[in-house]
Amino acid sequence: MAKKSMKARDVKRANLAEKFFAKRAELKAIVSDVNVSDEDRWNAVLKLQTLPRDSSPSRQRNRCRQTGRPHGFLRKFGLSRIKVREAAMRGEIPGLRKASW
């Protein structure tokens, strides 16, 4: 199990990313636009750097919904590989069964 503080930190990052998404996208569009003057682009870069670091989506980590485990995460289920296996063995995931060939 991940520490509660680590789970809370990821929730905080997700909220910040959602809050600053539009502002960040607007500034990134200015930075990548070649028709904008160099001064305006530089100002956009500086403004982008002043945004909170945790507002960047790349700072988020995929975590298991049940345990908060950051490694072995399967996006399709939102769970870690361990919890997916346990749920599959109990028959809780429809259509998922153990491979046999």
Curated annotation (Swiss-Prot):
The keyword Ribonucleoprotein applies. It holds the Pfam family Ribosomal_S14. GO terms for cellular component: cytoplasm; small ribosomal subunit. It comes from the Bacteria. Keywords: Ribonucleoprotein, Ribosomal protein, RNA-binding, rRNA-binding. GO terms for biological process: translation. One of its GO terms (molecular function) is structural constituent of ribosome. InterPro entries: Ribosomal_uS14, Ribosomal_uS14_bac/plastid, Ribosomal_uS14_CS. The keyword Ribosomal protein applies. NCBIfam families: PRK08881.1. Part of the 30S ribosomal subunit. Contacts proteins S3 and S10. HAMAP family: Ribosomal_uS14_1 (MF_00537). Belongs to the universal ribosomal protein uS14 family. Binds 16S rRNA, required for the assembly of 30S particles and may also be responsible for determining the conformation of the 16S rRNA at the A site. This is Small ribosomal subunit protein uS14. It comes from Proteus mirabilis (strain HI4320). The lineage of its organism: Bacteria, Pseudomonadati, Pseudomonadota, Gammaproteobacteria, Enterobacterales.
